[in-house]
Amino acid sequence: MSSVIFLGTPNFGSVVLQGLIEQGYEIKAVVTQPDKRVGRKQVVHQSAVKETALKHNLPVYQPAKLSGSEELAELMKIEPDFIITAAYGQFLPTKFLKSAKVAPVNVHGSLLPKYRGGAPIQYSVLNGDKETGVTIMEMVKKMDAGDIFAQKALPITDEDTSGTLFDKLSILGRDLLLETLPKFIDGTVTRTAQDEDKVVFSPNISKDQEKINLSMTAKEANNLIRALNPDPGAYFMLGGKRFKVWKAKPLTEKTSFPAGTLVTNKKKFVISMADGSQLELLEVQPTGKKKMNIKDYLNGQGSHFTIGDKIIDE
């Protein structure tokens, strides 16, 4: 079976790696991001890809930066058939990509050339797209610009979040990769150059983009909430403090209340947004609290507001 160096970090990559292992590919090395300390207690957190690799006793490399590292020198000596990446999170040196005997292949979470970059899944939700998908592509020096070997589309439902799409696309990407790799060996793989006129970029989500503001319609705010679930979460400022919203739904009825105002807190919590639109909050997280459904919030803090109160700070 073909030999592989695999590079990936989150669960998206872990699902792909597990598929390669189960199909009998010879995994020569696994490269993932360094362990992180998370939370108030600074607990050391390993990536999902590292956990999968250790479970199967595979050699793991975790350079802070692959370029110019000692780890890179070791990896260059392996010369595998394939170098495969799935949500690794670093640029790869061209000389390393060229060390693959057959091809350097990436599993990308969008229908390229739409959404090159680090947050393709988030942008598909943020922009209200009706479909997304995965692309199996050649890795080249320029980010996500290589030829396309295979693509498969996936509908986006109104209930989907980035989290649910990550899960769906990891399985779709795994299956499409495993379907495509044998075509390299038997010579039936096809390649299609990307149309540079149709390129759309999806840079990593910035801190400024996390905030729900008064210029957004209910639909736009809901798209942001879905796009940033499960991480980092969308928020607005309420009484000078962050108030995260994990789940909401836009209502069809219009209101005359100005944007950012409480429309009702009787059995449900509805706020007005731009253009007279209304957003019903379903799952929230006030600063210093755990996530809660809106019923629990209305039984406590949420009951103290009066219809017409300003909820979203400027």
UniProtKB/Swiss-Prot annotation:
Enzymatic reactions: L-methionyl-tRNA(fMet) + (6R)-10-formyltetrahydrofolate = N-formyl-L-methionyl-tRNA(fMet) + (6S)-5,6,7,8-tetrahydrofolate + H(+)
Annotated residues for binding of (6S)-5,6,7,8-tetrahydrofolate: S110, L111, L112, P113
Keyword Membrane: no
MF term (GO), any: methionyl-tRNA formyltransferase activity
Keyword terms, alphabetized: Protein biosynthesis, Transferase
The EC number(s) this enzyme carries: 2.1.2.9
Function according to Swiss-Prot or TrEMBL: Attaches a formyl group to the free amino group of methionyl-tRNA(fMet). The formyl group appears to play a dual role in the initiator identity of N-formylmethionyl-tRNA by promoting its recognition by IF2 and preventing the misappropriation of this tRNA by the elongation apparatus.
PANTHER family: METHIONYL-TRNA FORMYLTRANSFERASE, METHIONYL-TRNA FORMYLTRANSFERASE, MITOCHONDRIAL
Protein name: Methionyl-tRNA formyltransferase
Origin species: Lactobacillus johnsonii (strain CNCM I-12250 / La1 / NCC 533)
Phylogenetic placement of the source organism: Bacteria, Bacillati, Bacillota, Bacilli, Lactobacillales
